[in-house]
């Protein structure tokens, strides 16, 4: 876990989560409709349209990916301050190894979610495969 969130205010936490969300939007390849954020009359950040639960999950997984990358970068800076042998003895080395494995799993799951998202559409409340749009009979 990230102890930083225990040390910062709720406003700072919300700002950081907003940054993670904004960074995750470009990772979302080919959404069915544009995903954008605007500020409403109350000064709150809101999406310009309603997102499906699937789109929310994809953005959330993108936020996790960005957060893990941030953690890995922080540990990498620590590694650069120590010599190779000294770093291997620290718990940071073990933590980096675990984060690397977690990042691989998160990226795989994120790609799977995007793949499923791109292969269907919802019509009249039912999921419909778009496979026919990808594979067309040659005439």
Summary of predicted features, one role per range:
Residues 1-51, 112, 116-139:
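Conserved short "hinge" loops at termini or chain/domain junctions
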Residues 15-93, 107:
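Divalent metal-cofactor coordination and adjacent catalytic microenvironments
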Residues 91-124:
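Polybasic, proline/glycine-rich intrinsically disordered low-complexity segments
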